[in-house]
A protein has these predicted regions:
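Extracellular cysteine-rich, disulfide-stabilized repeat modules
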Residues: 19-22
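Extracellular repeat turn/loop positions enriched in glycine and acidic/polar residues, especially those
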Residues: 24-26
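Short, intrinsically disordered linker segments that flank or connect zinc-binding domains
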Residues: 4-12
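Metal-centered catalytic cores of metalloenzymes
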Residues: 51-60, 66-69, 123, 177-183, ...
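Cysteine-centered loop/knuckle micro-motif
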Residues: 30-34
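An N-terminal structural lobe/cap that precedes and organizes the functional/catalytic core
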Residues: 17, 35-140, 144-146
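Charge-dense, low-complexity intrinsically disordered regions
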Residues: 45-48, 207-377
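Internal, well-ordered alpha/beta segment that forms a basic, Gly-enriched binding/recognition surface
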Residues: 102-201
Length: 377
């Protein structure tokens, strides 16, 4: 549940009587969960007695229940083979490089009492960064220019490095909305809980906006127009100990000036996305940051700043937006295990703050955020 100081005035915090019921029944709320919302009161005292292990199990089960298969490639008539657990970060050349004994570290939810925090968890490279978003044929063919060839800052490569995290996030946003609808289905009383309805509205907005961006990419692909992607590329002369691929909105530029509002203030709000991929190579690291030119008004200034900044300034900025922007990040075991406890705690709490605006504000005011360096060698 998102923690905010005050709910925005332009977000509906109630479900309208003739609005489609958020439980997913496709009936009007008035004739579905509205009568049940007062009949089925949840016993929070009993819930709080549940052990954390049970809460974690229920959370993971509810999320796993939202899994679905789809091929997000643009030419569906060419689909062949089963939908597979496609890697959004390449396994052979990237994940293998930072793994030890075939494992990495990732962020996962950690249930402590009534609070959901975060912790590090070891994950197999066979499962890391995977999602059921492409058929076997398209997973191999579509991304061949970035899978089989070295990166050379070519237009088609930049398009694909942007599309891959977009596809992952489209899939995740659909699942997140389904996750919240399933909660309402199980717990009709929560349909009149303002915080839960706000999270539901946010999930609706995210699904709509990511699907809209997907359609923009689909149009460009069908027209073979790969030049609508602006890319900033930086090659480091050392290997980082993590890999990430994300699609997200950036709130502030390098000077701290606001670009976007990342908290939903209105249901007609637009989400302006950037695409970030960072991965190590032999004695080097590729950093690829892109946006679609339809969002040039939002990101032109930021990219001009990046193009004129020193490497130190760029890495300091990326150190923040990587953790703020995406959960799709995987660390080498050596990196996590060699962090000082204060650095490890800061990394975890900074990731948690990306999901909780009140916590982010508190850490910023205390100058206690981002006390780690992702780009240390």
């Amino acid at each position: 549940m998102m923690l905010i100081e005050k709910f925005p005035r332009n977000v509906r915090l109630t479900i309208g009587p003739y609005e489609q019921c958020p439980c997913g029944s496709k009936k009007s709320f008035k004739f579905c969960c509205k009568p049940k919302s007062t009949e089925h009161k949840h016993n929070w005292k009993e819930y709080r007695k549940h052990p954390d292990k049970r809460k974690k199990y229920e959370y993971v089960k509810n999320w796993n229940d939202t899994a679905f298969e789809i091929c997000l490639a643009f030419d569906h008539e060419e689909c062949r083979g089963n939908i597979k657990n496609a890697h959004s970060i390449q396994k052979k050349r990237i994940l293998n490089r930072i793994s030890r004994d075939g494992h990495l570290y990732q962020f996962i939810p950690d249930h402590v009492g009534d609070i959901v925090l975060a912790k590090f968890d070891r994950v197999s490279i066979n499962k890391a960064s995977t999602f059921q978003g492409f058929c076997d044929f398209h997973d191999n063919k579509l991304f061949l220019p970035i899978e089989a060839s070295d990166y050379c800052n070519e237009a088609r490569q930049n398009f694909l490095f942007s599309f891959r995290p977009l596809a992952l996030e489209c899939h995740n946003k659909i699942r997140d909305l389904t996750f919240r609808m399933n909660i309402f289905s199980e717990r009709p009383d929560l349909t009149i809980n303002e915080a839960m309805v706000y999270d539901y509205r946010t999930a609706q907005l995210n699904e709509r906006e990511f699907k809209k961006e997907y359609e923009v990419f689909k149009k460009d692909y069908s027209e073979k127009n790969f030049n609508n992607i602006r890319t900033f590329y930086l090659k480091l002369d050392f290997e980082v100990n993590f890999a990430t691929s994300g699609a997200f909105s950036v709130e502030f530029d390098m000077n701290g000036q606001q670009i976007n509002e990342n908290q939903m203030l209105s249901e007609i709000q637009e989400i302006k996305l950037i695409y970030l991929t960072i991965y190590p190579l032999e004695n080097s690291t590729n950093i690829i940051l892109s946006y679609h030119l339809r969002n040039d008004k939002s990101y032109n200034r930021l990219f001009e700043q990046l193009e004129n900044a020193s490497q130190t300034q760029i890495l300091k900025y990326l150190n923040k937006i990587v953790i703020n922007g995406t959960e799709n990040i995987y660390f080498s075991q050596n990196f996590i295990e060699n962090l000082k406890e204060a650095e490890k705690d800061s990394l975890l709490i900074s990731f948690q703050a990306s999901l909780k605006p009140l916590l982010a504000k508190k850490l910023y005011e205390e100058n206690n955020d981002y006390r780690f360096d992702l780009f240390t060698t």
